[in-house]
């Protein structure tokens, strides 16, 4: 069994984008009230006194959009400064990144993933649900700022949506040739948006790899991180290409993570809502730290039984939360 030592922490469920695959435009979202969010103190208590003692050493900050969280730089610094923290990273849409990229780096953040689903501003704005002023340039500025500051690896996440951005695969892959950037193609996963995307299906990673192989060739490669991507490289390129194939190539048997939602629910599996723990309510009602640790230890022990091991389009309507509410 894989050691589960990686926790994805959603700092906030709100986002300044409304990406089609994450927060479908037709969906009704009930945002978490501020008083229902884990406070900074509660979050740090859980990290330091519950998660680290049971073996978690790697942490990724997500959202919603994590940069919308007040005092996010201070929170990064607090987690990064814990001696047991072996790796701290963040996934962001990049829109608010440029002005604070250096501050985040100075606080101890070293790895960052930025969503970039299109190089075409019009398509990009369509995907993110932008109405009015284009947001592409500000995201691109955030990527450039992260590059200048020295985040390494700097990963760009691309969710491949059939008929929307799948014609840009080669252009996006080419970003890795001259810069040490790492472009990761993610198979579209219909969670909480089955009605919107049910007829579109998804493009498999093997198809994407073949497109790139036919153009430049591909070799096996590696990049620092603990994610599920299969990593390749265009011969002679400075960066790498990752393929996350959660729909076509089940990787549940090598899952090493759990997810903590912004309102304190610990979720052992992205695709299975069984076994979630409401840590915030337990913490606020006076349950001892020892008891919380034991609950998490038990969840770790049964995680292999909970892991979702199928891929069936019939499950798309079975999720009570969208990607933005889960934390991706």
UniProtKB/Swiss-Prot annotation:
Top-level taxonomic group: Bacteria
One of the GO BP terms on file: Mo-molybdopterin cofactor biosynthetic process
Reaction catalysed by this enzyme: GTP + AH2 + S-adenosyl-L-methionine = (8S)-3',8-cyclo-7,8-dihydroguanosine 5'-triphosphate + 5'-deoxyadenosine + L-methionine + A + H(+)
Binding site for [4Fe-4S] cluster 2: 252, 255, 269
Residues that, per the record, bind GTP: 8, 60, 91, 155, 257-259
Gene Ontology MF annotations: 4 iron, 4 sulfur cluster binding; cyclic pyranopterin monophosphate synthase activity; GTP 3',8'-cyclase activity; GTP binding; metal ion binding; S-adenosyl-L-methionine binding
Assembly behavior: Monomer and homodimer.
Family: Belongs to the radical SAM superfamily. MoaA family.
Name the record gives this protein: GTP 3',8-cyclase
Organism: Trichormus variabilis (strain ATCC 29413 / PCC 7937)
């Amino acid at each position: 069994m894989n050691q589960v030592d990686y926790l994805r922490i959603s700092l906030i469920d709100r986002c300044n984008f409304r990406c089609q695959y994450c927060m479908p435009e037709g969906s009704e979202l009930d945002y978490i009230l501020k008083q229902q969010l884990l406070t900074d103190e509660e979050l740090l208590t859980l990290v330091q006194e519950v998660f680290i003692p049971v073996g978690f050493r790697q942490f990724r900050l997500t959202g919603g959009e994590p940069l919308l969280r007040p005092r996010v730089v201070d929170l990064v610094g607090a987690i990064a400064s814990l001696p047991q923290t072996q790796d701290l990273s963040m996934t962001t849409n990049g829109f608010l990144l440029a002005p604070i990229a250096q501050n985040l780096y100075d606080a101890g953040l070293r790895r960052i993933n930025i969503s970039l689903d299109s190089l075409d501003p019009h398509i990009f704005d369509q995907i993110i649900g932008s109405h009015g002023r284009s947001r592409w340039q500000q995201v691109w500025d955030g990527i450039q700022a992260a590059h200048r500051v020295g985040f390494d690896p700097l990963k760009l996440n691309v969710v491949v949506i059939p008929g929307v951005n799948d014609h840009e695969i080669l252009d996006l892959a080419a970003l890795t040739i001259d810069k040490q950037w790492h472009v990761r193609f993610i198979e579209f996963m219909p969670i909480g948006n089955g009605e919107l995307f049910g007829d579109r299906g998804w493009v498999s990673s093997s198809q994407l790899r073949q497109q790139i192989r036919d153009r430049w060739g591909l070799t096996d490669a590696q990049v620092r991180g603990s994610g599920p991507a299969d990593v390749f490289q265009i011969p002679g390129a400075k960066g790498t290409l990752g393929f996350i194939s959660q729909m076509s190539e089940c990787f549940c048997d090598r899952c090493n993570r759990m997810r903590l939602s912004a309102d304190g629910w610990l979720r052992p599996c992205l695709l299975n809502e069984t076994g979630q723990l409401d840590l915030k309510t337990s913490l606020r009602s006076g349950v001892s730290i020892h008891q919380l640790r034991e609950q998490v230890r038990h969840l770790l022990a049964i995680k292999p039984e909970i892991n979702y091991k199928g891929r069936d389009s019939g499950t798309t309507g079975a999720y009570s939360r969208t990607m933005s509410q889960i934390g991706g």
